[in-house]
Curated annotation (Swiss-Prot):
Phosphorylated by CheA. Phosphorylation of the N-terminal regulatory domain activates the methylesterase activity. PANTHER family: PROTEIN-GLUTAMATE METHYLESTERASE/PROTEIN-GLUTAMINE GLUTAMINASE, PROTEIN-GLUTAMATE METHYLESTERASE_PROTEIN-GLUTAMINE GLUTAMINASE. CDD domains: CheB_Rec, REC_CheB-like. Residues 160-350 form the CheB-type methylesterase domain. It comes from Photobacterium profundum (strain SS9). This is Protein-glutamate methylesterase/protein-glutamine glutaminase 1. Coiled coil: none annotated. It is found in: Cytoplasm. One of its GO terms (biological process) is chemotaxis.
Amino acid sequence: MVVDDSAVVRQVVSSVLKSDSEIEVCGAVADPLFAMTRMRMQWPDVIVLDIEMPRMDGISFLKKIMAERPTPVVICSTLTEKGADTTMQAISAGAVEIITKPKVGLKGFLHDSAKVLINAVKAASRANLKPLQRAMASNLKVTPKLSADAVLAEGNTSRLKTTEQLVAIGTSTGGTQALELVLKALPRVSPGIVIVQHMPEKFTAAFAERLDSLCEISVKEAKHKMRVLPGQALIAPGGKHMLLKRSGAQYYVEVIDGPLVSRHRPSVDVLFRSVAQSASGNALGIIMTGMGDDGVKGMLEMRRAGAVTLAQDEASCVVYGMPKEAVKCGAVERSLSLSEIPQAILDCSH
C-alpha cells in the first residue's frame, strides 16, 4: 500500500511497483485515515509511507501500526534536514527502509530510481519484525567483564605492529534499530568502531546525531581523515565510501567518492577490505541484518587476514541476507544473537 498526500507520488510509485510481477499494489491513498479504512478490508504486507501529511502525520500512523499489527514500512522522505530528522523518528518507531524523493523533478526521479524503490519494497517484504521487537523490549545492557576492487585494490595486509583493537560493522535493512540497540549497550570504555549502514546521503548525519544522544560512547558521521578513537563510533556518510587507514599505531578513515560497489555506496565490502589491509588481526568484523551480499567478500578477506569475524544469527535478524551469505562462503567464525554482540565487542579489547 502507498500512503502519500501527493497524487503524483501515488501514481508514479504505484506504477513503478506494478511493473514488477512479484509486487501487487493493493491501494494508494492520500493520508493515514484513508489507509486505516482500506486496511480493515485488506492488510498489506508492506506500506510505503510519506511522513509529512495532513490529518495524521506519518510518525503517529507508524506508531499506531506497530502497536496494533507490526508491518514492514518503507519511508518515502524528502531530501531535506527536516526530512532527515523526521525520518530518524520513523526509523526509531520501527520503519525498516528509507527511500528519498526530491522536492522538484519528482516524477523523473522516481522513474530513474525504480530499481531502488522495488528493491526496498522487496527487502521490507522479507523483514521479520519480531526479533527486533523482542530485543527493543529487553533493552540490551552489557556489564563489561573486569579481568572492494573499484575503490580499493586487493593487496597485502599491513605488517606494522599495533595493539589497538578496532571493530568494523556492516549492516542494511533493519540495521538502524539493531545498531541502536548494540551501541546503546556499550560503556564509554569501548574499542573504536567504524560502521557502514546502507542509508541515503543527508540521512546519516541525523542518524549519527540521534545515536550520539542515546549512547554512552560518542557517535559521529565520519569526515575525511578523522581519527578512529576508543569510545567512539564513526558512521560512513551516505553517498560516500569509507576506508580505514593507519598511520603508525593510529587508525583514521578516508571518506571518498567512487562507483557503486556491490550495488551500494557506502559499501560494506570496501570498508571490510580496508580493515583487512590496515588492521588485519587487530580487528573484529561484524556483519548484521540486511538484504543482499554486500560485505561478504570483504569479511572473507578480513578472516584470511587474521581478524575475528562474526555474524548476527538468523533468529535475531530482520532480514537474514548478508549474514547468511557470509556464513555460506566461510567468512564467519561464529554467529551470535543481537543481544550477544555488545559483549563480543567488549571482549575483543581484552
